[in-house]
Every structure is written in structure tokens, then in C-alpha cells.
Amino acid sequence: YVRSVNAGASICHLHGPYTIDEEIQADGTRLSDLDIPGWAKLRQDIYDGCTAKPIIQYGIANGRFPQRKELMIDQRPDMISTCFNPHDECFDYEPGREPVELYGLHNRPELEEYCRVTGELGVKIEAECFHYGGVWNAQRMLQKGLLKPPVWITFFLGWRGGSYTPPTAEAMLYNHHHLPEGFLYNTSVMDPAEQWKILTVAIILGGHVRVGMEDNPFLSAGEYAKS
């Protein structure tokens, strides 16, 4: 994080300490449990090492809302990632390893509550959109006066699971050309072979990009980044 900020990155997307449910729960979810004090320590370590103060965006949108609300009240991050479509992820990018799977509905009443709480606390929402239904939900919150423009969204391409959007230039162009007024977008690509091509398209179109160990731990196919 520190080297990225000192090299010019403006937003740090943080994953503080957390654990994932070992199995699908009775309510159909498989989500994350957060170590709230650990998040504060990670943020402070970043502040201490940076020459300029970055925007801190708390991730792990697959955390449960009551605990994430507690996290926001306790620490007031600049931004928080909020999944605006159902979580249905299948991290099976390494052959031979058991995939990590996540499930959560994130219905509109929950999204409305996210918008109310973040508005009261002065925390900016990042609306995660794994497919275009997430944009529709964000528009819905904007029309109801619960989200304030500009709405900041992230398009996720190549993230496997039931909310998958293919990592192609055509998909990137579709997202760009259907962007509603009052929206700004960021792009994340989880595909080692296609990442740099799609991010280049996003930049040319005037969008923003997200890179790092979560999105793609490879510098090129089969070559892991060292940190």
C-alpha cells in the first residue's frame, strides 16, 4: 500500500484481518467475519508510511452488514465498498486447489440501510457492480435520494461465479457506453492474460483502474508478483 501511494495511487482498498465462514450458513450465506481492531492498525500503518494521506476505502463487501456498520462507526473510513448485486463468487483460479466460494443476497432494503448509515457518517460508498444489475440498483438509490452524485462504482470483469462478466473489450465498452449521468467508474479485472488489455481500454475511455494482489497476483501469466 505505502509504495503504491508514494508512487501516485490515490485510493487504498483495504482488506483488514478477516475469516470466511467454513460452510454455507442456514440462511444461504457464506460471508466474512471481521477483526475490527485489526483494520484500524492496518490503516494507521499505511498513514505512518505514506508521504501523502491517501483515500482509505474499506473492502470486504462480503462482510455482514451489522459488523460493517460497527466498523464504520468505530473508524469512519473515507469510503466503503458495498456490493450492489448478489455476492456469488467462485475463486478457482489455481488448478488443484479447493475454490473459495462466497454467497450473499444484498437486497435493496440492505442497500438502502447502507446508504443511510454512510450518509450519516460521511462515508462515501463505492458501489461494486459485478454485472449491470448493480448499476441499476445504484440508480435506484440515487433516484430515492439515498446516494448523492457523483456515484462511484467499480466494474468487475473476469471475477468468476454467478455474477460473472467476461473480461473482454466488448464488455468494457458496454459498461462505459451505458454509464448513467452522474456516475464515475473504476475497473477491476481478475484475469492474468486479459487484465492489462482491459485496463488500457478503461483508461483510454477516461475511466479509472484498480490493480493489486486481490485483483490479479500475476505480473504475467504464471509469474507471481513478489509483494
Outline where the language-model segments fall.
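Alpha-helix-loop-beta-strand connector modules within alpha/beta enzyme cores
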Residues: E23-Y58, E113-T118, L173-G182
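Glycine-rich, proline-tolerant flexible connector loops at the mouths of alpha/beta enzymes
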Residues: S10-W39, F156-W159, N216-A221
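Non-catalytic positions within long, well-ordered alpha-helices that form the structural scaffold/packing
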Residues: V5-N6, I73, G119, I203
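A structural motif
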Residues: N6-A9, P77, G206-G207
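Catalytic alpha/beta core domains of metabolic enzymes, predominantly
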Residues: M79-E214
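C-terminal functional modules
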Residues: A225-S227
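Short, acidic/polar
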Residues: Y1-R3, R64-M72, Q195-L199
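A generic, well-ordered mixed alpha/beta core segment in the N-terminal half of proteins
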Residues: W39-P86
